[in-house]
Amino acid sequence: MLGDLATWVQDVIERLGAVGVALLVVLENVFPPIPSEIVLPFAGFVAQRGDGSVLAMIVAATIGAVVGALVLYGIAASIGPVRLSHFIERFGRWFGVKPADLARAEAWFDRHAVAAVLLGRCVPLIRSVVSVPAGFRRMRLAPFVVFTALGSVVWNTALIGAGAILGDQWEKVEPYVAVLQYVVVAVIVLLVARFAVTKLRRRA
């Protein structure tokens, strides 16, 4: 399955160039099985061999990232904080989440929205998800777009640049991104475990 997906991704970039990169990155933001660690390094390789430029690939990928982020932002914003609060009030107990927990999370995001979006766009697995709380909190659109773009430029430049440098060995980028993903998953698991332990201690 993943092999077929990788082949399709490469075929799209071969046929459409920078436009294909932009479209794939839009899809990658809203459809996680499309992996940026394949899209972006391969785009760098294609540019390195002369079919386009590295700069064009970075610009295209960044435009795609912003458009994809806006899709998730728009969906979350259409739900809004009131509906989310009502959902937590009704069903939060099934997830061990109380309205007070949601309020604290919202307050934290409101204080750190810019940093969360900017840095979140540079972190595997978090890159797309960070658009959701931004939408729920209806973060002002201009800062959201600007800092989504800035964070995406960092990520896109790193992976496309690596692909261009490695050339036909661009696939070597993927294992390093995989390690970062494992680290992120481990951190998330630890945070969830800490949250669960804290909740249990409060009930005891």
What residue ranges belong to the model's regions?
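Transmembrane alpha-helical segments of integral membrane proteins
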Residues: N156-Q169
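Short amphipathic helix-loop junctions that connect adjacent transmembrane helices
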Residues: L40-Q48
